[in-house]
From Swiss-Prot:
Protein name: Minor fimbrial protein PrsF
Matches recorded under InterPro entries: Adhesion_dom_fimbrial, Adhesion_dom_fimbrial_sf, Adhesion_dom_sf, Bact_Fimbrial_Adh_Pro, P_pili_tip_PapF
GO CC term, one of those recorded: extracellular region
Major place of residence: secreted
Keyword Signal included in the entry's annotation: yes
GO biological process: cell adhesion involved in single-species biofilm formation
Signal sequence, start to end: 1-18
Matches recorded under Pfam families: Fimbrial (PF00419)
Keywords in alphabetical order: Cell adhesion, Fimbrium, Secreted, Signal
Length: 167
């Protein structure tokens, strides 16, 4: 009988020491970036440019690039990062030639600057140049002269990185 009482007492005591524990659940809702131009580099070739024609409004090259976005909810954002020319226009990439850069615009034409930089982290909202039916984005590149500085002849180059994401 003493053993039975002791067993029941131990059983009741062990029930009394049970306590609630917290369950922590964590994760990350990951929005995958878009694949741009099938993962291939984008080449913008201006060929030969007459320095007298570099007036920030002529000689544009328009590119249509494919975009494949596995997640399409919200607005499309674009981030283009590279060396800016620092001329008060935040859409001009610097080149290796003094006073010469390449201005970028969303869409065809020069009405919507393609702002360079991180913006809000995802870049800047796409407001022109998006064709969702064809899954393409169009941008325009324009030779840019900073002020009235003399442009020396020679090969020029610049690079930038582009990413796009819906958010």
């Amino acid at each position: 009988m003493i053993r039975l009482s002791l067993f029941i007492s131990l059983l009741l005591t062990s029930v009394a020491v049970l306590a609630d524990v917290q369950i922590n659940i964590r994760g990350n809702v990951y929005i995958p970036p878009c694949t741009i131009n099938n993962g291939q580099n984008i080449v913008v070739d201006f060929g030969n440019i007459n320095p007298e024609h570099v007036d920030n409004s002529r000689g544009e090259v328009t590119k249509n690039i494919s975009i494949s976005c596995p997640y399409k909810s919200g607005s499309l954002w674009i981030k283009v990062t590279g060396n800016t020319m620092g001329v008060g226009q935040n859409n001009v990439l610097a080149t290796n030639i003094t006073h010469f850069g390449i201005a970028l615009y969303q869409g065809k034409g020069m009405s919507t600057p393609l702002t360079l930089g991180n913006g809000s982290g995802n870049g800047y909202r796409v407001t022109a140049g998006l064709d969702t039916a064809r899954s393409t984005f169009t941008f325009t590149s324009v030779p840019f002269r900073n002020g009235s500085g003399i442009l020396n002849g020679g090969d020029f180059r610049t690079t930038a990185s582009m990413s796009m994401i819906y958010n």
